[in-house]
């Protein structure tokens, strides 16, 4: 269910703002979105997996907090990230 190291590094390379950037809000939101999308596929097969559902809800909340932070700091970066990730906002 977790992302492999290769998947993580590909996402980091795509969304990083500098060569050594691995912790910017954009990278963190992109990684959380990939994990969330992967878990949603898991729940189509395992509807009763409430333990993992709790983890999914935590990830969604963390992503929301990071997006709110980014929106407060720089609206242009926020809008660009939302569009690139295909989130509904």
From Swiss-Prot:
Recall the GO molecular function terms of this protein's record: rRNA binding; structural constituent of ribosome
Q: Which SUPFAM superfamilies match?
A: S15/NS1 RNA-binding domain (SSF47060)
Per the record's keyword annotation, is Ribosomal protein included, yes or no?
yes
Q: Tell me the domain of life.
A: Bacteria
What does the annotation say about its assembly with partners?
Part of the 30S ribosomal subunit. Forms a bridge to the 50S subunit in the 70S ribosome, contacting the 23S rRNA.
HAMAP family documented for this protein = Ribosomal_uS15_B
Name of the protein: Small ribosomal subunit protein uS15
Please report the organism this UniProt entry assigns to the protein. Saccharophagus degradans (strain 2-40 / ATCC 43961 / DSM 17024)
